[in-house]
Amino acid sequence: MSTRNSRSELEKTAVQLFRKLGTRTVLFHQAAAQALGLFPTDLKSADILNEAGPMTAGELGKKTGLSTGSVTALVDRLEKAGYVAREKDPNDRRRVVIVPLTASKKHIKDLFRPLSESTMDLCREYTEEELELIFSFVGKAADIMEEELERLKQ
């Protein structure tokens, strides 16, 4: 096999593996949401809030691509389940921000702990240099996914 064919096959394999990982990730998050009594979009929105911190419903809508009405219903569900609270914006008392609650972070973290531990075990199979290369590649792949997400939203 020539280097060109080998390279082409490796690239195809990368695409196939990312598709496989993406599918497994979606299915895992659906099961995790169900275990928490949430819808998958609710769980991912809670994750966005835990990662980015407090934001308005409009900002959450932009990040998720959900309509205003859908975000309102989603925040209602998350608030009722104890994952978020609505608070007045300390910088503008006319605005309301959605704040992730610390207890909910722990609850979600506990659910994901086995996956995190398995991922750390996997990392131990590689050298620091290999991990840096893997992280660079995966980080760039995540950037591509973000760009494609924005393209689809337009």
Curated annotation (Swiss-Prot):
<dbReference type="GO" id="GO:0003700">
    <property type="term" value="F:DNA-binding transcription factor activity"/>
</dbReference>
<dbReference type="InterPro" id="IPR000835">
    <property type="entry name" value="HTH_MarR-typ"/>
</dbReference>
<keyword id="KW-0805">Transcription regulation</keyword>
<feature type="DNA-binding region" description="H-T-H motif">
    <location>
        <begin position="57"/>
        <end position="80"/>
    </location>
</feature>
<keyword id="KW-0804">Transcription</keyword>
<dbReference type="GO" id="GO:0003677">
    <property type="term" value="F:DNA binding"/>
</dbReference>
<dbReference type="Pfam" id="PF01047">
    <property type="entry name" value="MarR"/>
</dbReference>
<feature type="domain" description="HTH marR-type">
    <location>
        <begin position="7"/>
        <end position="143"/>
    </location>
</feature>
<protein>
    <recommendedName>
        <fullName>Uncharacterized HTH-type transcriptional regulator YcgE</fullName>
    </recommendedName>
</protein>
<dbReference type="GO" id="GO:0006355">
    <property type="term" value="P:regulation of DNA-templated transcription"/>
</dbReference>
<dbReference type="GO" id="GO:0006950">
    <property type="term" value="P:response to stress"/>
</dbReference>
<keyword id="KW-0238">DNA-binding</keyword>
<dbReference type="InterPro" id="IPR036390">
    <property type="entry name" value="WH_DNA-bd_sf"/>
</dbReference>
<dbReference type="InterPro" id="IPR011991">
    <property type="entry name" value="ArsR-like_HTH"/>
</dbReference>
<dbReference type="InterPro" id="IPR039422">
    <property type="entry name" value="MarR/SlyA-like"/>
</dbReference>
<dbReference type="InterPro" id="IPR036388">
    <property type="entry name" value="WH-like_DNA-bd_sf"/>
</dbReference>
